[in-house]
Amino acid sequence: FKVNQQIGGGTWVYLGTFTFDKGRNDYGMVVLSNESKEKGVVCADAVRFGGGMGNIARGGQTSGLPRYLEGARYSAQWAGMPYSVYGGYEGKNDMNDDINVRSRTVNYLAGKSLFNPTEEGLGIPFEMSMALHSDAGFSKEDEIIGTLGIYTTNFNNGKLHAGTDRHASRDLSDILLTQLQRDIRSTFNVDWTRRSLWNRNYSETRLPAVPSTIVELLSHQNFADMRLGHDPNFKFTVGRALYKAILQYICSQHGKDYVVQPLPVSHFAIRFGQKKNTLELSWQGEEDPLEPTAKPREYIVYTRIGRGGFDNGVRVSSPSHTVKIEPGIVYSFKVTAVNRGGESFPSEILAAYKAKREKGQILIVNGFDRISGPAVIDTPDAAGFDLSQDPGVPYLYDISLCGAQQNFSRKEAGRRLGESSDEYEGMKIIGNTFDYPFVHGKAIQAAGNYSFVSCSDEAVEKGILSLEDYPIVDYILGLEKEDNSSNPARNTYYKTFSSPMQRILTSYCQSGGHLLVSGAYVGSDMDSSQGNKEFIQNILKYRHGNSLKTDGDKIAVRGLGHTFTLPRLPNEQSYPVTSPDCILPMSPAFPVMTYAIGNTPAAVAYQGNDYRTFVMGFPFESIREETSRNAIMASILRFLTTDYTD
């Protein structure tokens, strides 16, 4: 890391997120070293791990929430800002201080820099300020409210602190709204509304020393807006649009061309290499149809050994990489694309393992790509989001959920419609971590003497890997399902078994393969057409019974000599399985697991002379206890491989 110690003193400098072993140990430390070819010393007043819990007391009590969920006024105090920045109302009106402290913090951090030369401060060259808000307002006709931009010109004789005309704030606001509307309309094929540009007197656009704007992205009070707003795909599009707009603005101020960071790579796959104890990684760079400059030029491959953290990565010029490995250790990999503009979001995480005494190879296919908002209620009388049916799938995690919606009455629009409880406040709710080949792989490792590699389902569908090369295939489906109701404008396809995958799995089974499938919607997602039903009934040997409905925070499952549980409610350890599928065997298949409630089949096995299948109506990785996962995987592998003819 490069840290300029001549600016920004007296406050925290974020270095990154790192993995440490739990508890106290000899390696749980940060070492400060002065070893360098250059003159000078490295110094730090303090090192902080994590953001911590709120500790600014009011009325003798703290909030009890993580600091990142508290207001800006408390954050600024803990970050080392002077009292004049955060205490204008002397502790008597935290709300007003919270509004003003955002701008005053920017001014203090940028003080004595080129962009705020007239104020004292830390010299950090902030060039602009953007406040991202949601707005009020509602439509009883389910029309989108859309985005509003706000700026202020009538202050300080129309000048900013560096002498720049305050109309620069209008330019910034215009660029942001234009990019947002263009990208949302193009990505989701929805008529997203650009409301207007307001030249008004707001603290966050009046006080900053630099060009500033408020972006009122959408209405949190309006069902049509929030139907999009809850979708992580929408959040990514919005975030990328704002980033691109800010980049355009700053580069235009300096007369420079801009380059946008690439999109994440796709079609990621791992094979065993031609040389002994090697792995061959391959992937595909993605073009951005909305941004011609976002072309990948190079890639960074990150490696994780066992349960450790990822390394700093290896830069490669082509979409492939060969890695030497040591038998007996599980390796995990993720890939990013890079160009002059920066680094993309990471790929899904794939894992591989070479057994010391190999008796077979397994291919793990990751088909769990879904990220989604919660289930939707949309009737003439009711509107909202039903967390009890499906709380959605956050990208990695979600910190914004307060609780389940309580009021669904459309008659209450603009008043109590959308009112929620607070049981999830302060929770970091786990979503799709894109790291489940590792969970499956560790269970395979524990079963003994099986090697494995993994790949994305896109790589299989494109023919990059052939299932027939592997005697056993483990197909991860997690919470994958086709879901148009939560966001009807979504253009992403999350089918459990796509048409190409159905053909590939049919061919694999008919060639004598051994297939493990697990997912919460392997039955219900295949009820939409006769062709889908025939595939699961004739090839995978099961049919959909119903979706399990139950109360409580966990679901008990029995089978293969074990009883284990699945999480049913949002939590901080693993994604919830709200209503897994009950699947019924098609003769001569038979049930091998049951849900404790109702004693309905949870898993079905088929042992034919031609091929074998083991299908679970819940995700394997959602089994809470690792010992249970290991035991269940060992039993499944025995079933798939044992010769029962003797």
Give the positions of each predicted feature.
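A glycine-rich, often tryptophan-bearing local segment used as a flexible ligand/cofactor-contacting loop or short
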Residues: 479-593, 597, 632
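Active-site-adjacent mobile loop/cap segments within catalytic or ligand-binding domains
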Residues: 33-35, 46-54, 113, 131-158, ...
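Aromatic-Pro/Gly-enriched surface loop or interdomain linker
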Residues: 59, 348-472, 476-479, 634-644
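A glycine-centered loop/beta-turn motif at secondary-structure junctions
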Residues: 207-220, 241, 470, 510-518, ...
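Pro/Thr/Ser/Gly-rich low-complexity, intrinsically disordered linker/stalk tracts
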Residues: 249-293, 327, 342-360
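Active-site microenvironments of hydrolase-like enzyme catalytic domains
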Residues: 71-170, 198-221
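Short alpha-beta junction capping motif
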Residues: 357-368, 375-387, 463-529, 607, ...
